[in-house]
């Protein structure tokens, strides 16, 4: 093989810098904007604002196309609210319909396809064909493969959690990392969107402002404690992204890539994965795993991110440990035992009882409840024991009186029949 052909093979493994390629400005294409509009309507067509947008969608899309072409587009002001899920509080900015259309264009046509080649396979969040089930399955494969290689469960697994992940993404580092990989026609829009995420820190002293980038930021605490009259627009902190924004989801997938590359390439970790801010490393010794975690901590520090010391820990593979809300144990015979966390079942039982009240006052229908319960049980049943499933089905029948029909010869169909026999 000639040196020239080898050079072609080597260079073809890495994407060409995209801002050097002549490309069509897809941001202003009406067909692309229309597809983005349809995508934005999914799941929200019943809301008032999307319906108003739909009534004049041609003129709205034409105006957006003109603003994007002239580079006069600005993100609209939106409502801010606190969303509570699984005991966590998240600060969400409800994006306007026109802004959601622009986000779909930028992410679906530029960010997602252009950044995907730089991601590792075991980066499982917010990507087509991947998701939380994908991440869990890959974690289980890594556990099985460890046993197949070593024929024992004497190894260790380390877990790393990035604290206030979205709150502490620095805009300058995002621009430095992302913009060279996308065309300039999209880079200006990326910079414009980041402006809406800037945090008004006019209340800070000069010393606090000088150190704010190196200090962990908490958007919930900021929203609850800093009064509106203190946010005068005098100075802004170029840090934090909105967790509810589609651009933020793409950034959450891509931004910690240096951490992934450090673990997979520099340290050569065979069994490593990341789901947004949740990371795992499997190794033969505790010292090996600790060394990788220390290196990850340094990489996170370079990115301006913070390690959650309370949630970062190392466990024996033979012990019971939790990843992505599932409890795992690797036995000495190579079997992976997985169980749903009990608090998840308790939470769903409370939800069913709350749904009963909502049905009684007319805010939900029995069909809505069945759809919610069917979705939850269908997703979680592979992590539940037969007794747990039967008890959940019994509670559903006690509260709503109906019986859900499952796929014939499926596990849920069999257990539903067993539940009917015992109750009968």
Question: Where in the sequence are the language-model features?
Answer:
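Right-hand nucleic-acid polymerase module
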Residues: 2-10, 95, 100, 104, ...
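A common structural junction motif
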Residues: 182, 297-305
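Conserved polymerase palm-domain catalytic core
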Residues: 142, 149-276, 280-295, 315, ...
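Amphipathic alpha-helical blocks
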Residues: 53-77
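Active-site-proximal segment of RNA-dependent polymerases
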Residues: 21-23, 109-170
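Short, conserved non-catalytic motifs in the polymerase core
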Residues: 45-51, 76-101, 118-131, 201-253
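Non-catalytic, polymerase-adjacent accessory regions of viral genome-replication enzymes
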Residues: 1-62, 413, 418-424
């Amino acid at each position: 093989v000639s040196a020239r052909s080898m050079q072609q093979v080597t260079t073809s493994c890495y994407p060409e810098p995209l801002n050097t390629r002549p490309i069509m400005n897809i941001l202003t294409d009406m067909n692309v904007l229309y597809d983005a509009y349809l995508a934005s309507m999914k799941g929200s067509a019943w809301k008032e604002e999307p319906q108003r947008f739909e009534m004049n969608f041609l003129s709205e899309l034409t105006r957006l196309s003109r603003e994007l072409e002239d580079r006069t587009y600005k993100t609209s002001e939106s409502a801010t609210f606190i969303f509570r899920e699984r005991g966590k509080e998240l600060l969400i900015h409800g994006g306007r319909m026109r802004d959601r259309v622009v986000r779909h264009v930028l992410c679906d046509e530029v960010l997602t396809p252009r950044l995907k080649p730089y991601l590792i396979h075991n980066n499982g969040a917010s990507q087509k064909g991947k998701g939380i089930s994908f991440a869990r399955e890959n974690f289980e494969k890594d556990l099985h493969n460890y046993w197949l290689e070593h024929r024992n469960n004497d190894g260790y697994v380390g877990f790393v959690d990035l604290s206030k992940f979205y709150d502490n993404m620095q805009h300058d580092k995002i621009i430095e990392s992302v913009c060279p990989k996308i065309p300039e026609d999209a880079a200006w829009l990326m910079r414009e969107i980041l402006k809406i995420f800037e945090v008004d820190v006019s209340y800070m002293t000069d010393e606090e402002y000088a150190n704010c980038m190196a200090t962990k930021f908490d958007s919930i605490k900021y929203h609850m404690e800093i009064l509106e009259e203190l946010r005068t627009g005098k100075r802004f902190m170029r840090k934090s992204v909105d967790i509810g924004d589609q651009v933020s989801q793409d950034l959450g997938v891509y931004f910690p890539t240096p951490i992934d590359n450090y673990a997979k390439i520099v340290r050569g970790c065979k069994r490593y994965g990341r789901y947004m801010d949740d990371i795992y490393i499997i190794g033969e010794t505790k010292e090996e795993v600790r060394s990788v975690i220390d290196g990850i901590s340094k990489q996170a520090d370079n990115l301006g991110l913070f390690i959650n010391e309370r949630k970062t820990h190392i466990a024996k593979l033979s012990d019971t440990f939790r990843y992505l809300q599932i409890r795992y144990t690797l036995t000495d015979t190579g079997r992976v035992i997985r169980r749903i966390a009990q608090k998840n079942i308790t939470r769903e039982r409370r939800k069913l009882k709350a749904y009963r009240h909502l049905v009684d006052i007319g805010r939900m229908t029995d069909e809505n409840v069945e759809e919610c319960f069917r979705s939850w049980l269908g997703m979680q049943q592979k992590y539940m024991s037969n007794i747990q499933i039967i008890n959940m089905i019994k509670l559903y029948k006690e509260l709503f009186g109906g019986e859900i029909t499952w796929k014939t010869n499926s596990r849920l169909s069999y257990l539903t029949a067993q539940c009917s026999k015992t109750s009968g």
